[in-house]
Curated annotation (Swiss-Prot):
Phosphothreonine carried by residues: 280
Record-level GO BP terms: chromatin organization; DNA replication; establishment of protein localization to chromatin
Protein name per Swiss-Prot or TrEMBL: Leucine-rich repeat and WD repeat-containing protein 1
Compartments it resides in: Nucleus; Chromosome, Centromere; Chromosome, Telomere; Cytoplasm, Cytoskeleton, Microtubule organizing center, Centrosome
Amino acid sequence: MEKITEKILLEKSSTKTNKLDQIKTLNLSRMSLKSEDLPVPLLSKLCRLEKLDLSGNMLQKIPKGLRLPCLKILNCSNNDMEDVLSLEALTNLEELRLEDNLYLTVNDEHKVIFLLPNLRMFNGKDISSTAHHIRHGSTEILRKRVIGVWERDFSLPDPISAKSLAAVEKSFVNAACTQVKYGPNSLSDYTKWRVEKIAKEYLKSLTSSEEEERVADTTPTKENKTKACDVGGNSITSPQKRTRNNTDVVAEASPRKSSRLVSAAPVEASPRKSARVLNTPQKTQPVVSSPRKHARLTSAETPESSPRKSSRLENVTQKAASQTESPRKPGMSTPTSKQAKCESPRKQSKQSTAKMEKSTPRKTTKAKLQVPQEPVSLTPLHVLQCHSRQNDPDDFSTQLWACAFEPQQDDSIDISGGSQTIATCGGETLCVINCESGLVLKKYKVPGEDFFSLAWSTVLMSRTGGSARPCNILAAGGKRGCVKLIHPRVNLAFGEFRVSRRAISIMRFNPRKPTFLFTGTYDKKIFLWDIGGLDQDYNFKISKLLTLETSSTPLHLALLPSSPDTHLLSGCDEGLYCFDVQLSKNTLKRNEEIEIVFPIYKKNDKKNNYRTIDGLSFLSDDVVASKSHMQGSIYLWSWSATRASWNSRKKEVPAVILAELQWSSTDIPYLSLGTCPGYGYVVCGDEQGRLWMYHITDTMMENFKSGKTISATEVLQWPSPIRAGKGALEGPSINSTAMDPGLHYLVALTDKNMVVVWKRESH
């Protein structure tokens, strides 16, 4: 049965008429239309159509041959668009929306702006100046470089024949695409496309000149006219071929670029559902099911249902969390955390780096840790529900995935190294929270996004007539595969860039080089980016430095605290890998250097291979805490001893285990752990809302020789917040935890839209 008929077109029109050629506005949104469902002969009768809404469908391209000569406004947001070249026929477009098309990149955006000569509004923004540069600004530069390639290495064949000319054209185009470089690497696809067009046009102009010299009277060129209905007595012809150009505009980072907010609710399935890595996100399911695995899927019918279990419709008493500041209001200063008494932080641990025998399952060499001997005491301070979709107070299904404390700058008053400000993400929102007051200082919302990861960094911002000043920025990403860059202090989302067509699973800044950002994606890759510094207008330049190939989805990234520029550890869905990330080497694409394997892998279990590393963090310069799904414990192991035992002829190296910490026996995956190196703490939440805390002191390290499993120092019970009229809430799963460096606060994120803040008791 045809989805689009003449009757439907007349019904969907805002113009009350019985003639197709009188329709000026047409709404075909949310009809589950595919490209083949658009009948070209029928739609071509809409010769006076000016505004068309095709949002919320499953279109991959605009059908070939569709001519809408009067169309000025087109909305193709929230589709499956892959081919923007199909839009070239709509030459009179002035306004176009392509948000929420997962497969489109910044290269496609540049192509669209170039192909549509009258386009002035793109995704709701005025692009007049950008479009002028894309269409005209850099044509001569590219053209001169292409001509230089021709004059240096090529000439016309003599005599000219179709076969010889085709061979020359192929060689010339390939050489030009290879040799001509312009703009950032992120625009290489667009640049190559432009260079190919310019090279072909230049060669065609040479052959035309050659023909004119040989033939006295020229043959008139046949004009190709586009058929169109007569509007006002004037036929509409296709424009002459335009000279196309590249751009040196900073890729993927327009100044003061806000997070692209869209009104249409997306319907794509999240990449963190059942199979963990979706091959093709589908839009046929109205339910947005968030992360990550079979065990966490639910049968609940609410639109954003929890992927783990059936949704328990529970609420929580909010403390000062319902009043949140609008993200577009003038920014308020991020408060500095108040001073608090703290013990002296841990010094760098000194580990033995002597080569270990492979047969030794547990390393008995003592790691010297200098941490406070007395454990801390924590009490629950706030339970916040601040990530609700559409501000729904009954939203207890949105999963919260990542949190991180704001870094303290060098001029901070707080000598303890602590911070009161934490960023949290989950669902469509990113929140910046003051742990002491429980106030949500800033809240950023991107409809249709599902944030999985975030990271803080302190970068330099240049100032006119003065020295550069440091500012804390926040990077966040998730299902859409784009990194959003935010300066919370001034309440500004200033840029974004696309990392992948698949979702972002994890991100981490290099603490030694604050502009270096690692991003892990669901297409089994880890990218290293340099976002550069910021100018006074928040312009920045993004460049890709490395591509690391993984065998499965990266879930956690950890840089060596003592040498973050040399090696990267990646906990993945199918193992723990180590990568060489030194930029002094020429190879820009790399595979893992070694795989670190654990004793749990030897356990015979047909249902689970225990290779999913869903927790990874450094406890000191050398001691690493990690765990596998279904393991029921946490390993502490030595990085230096493990690497020293590596035989370069083998990819696998057994981890040199220092201790095994008893944890919950749960089958729920992706319950990550956190560490506080300065106080020797490892913390991991479980499926009942409890927090297992391990205080790793010098005395405990002495006992590691026994090889016995060590119990938790303390297990913090779920605080059981009370919802008015409905009693206490059951404990949810704790997806993620974070502690500030001074261990003033411990924050836990749940799979039921609750942020729990614990505070250390002062003595």
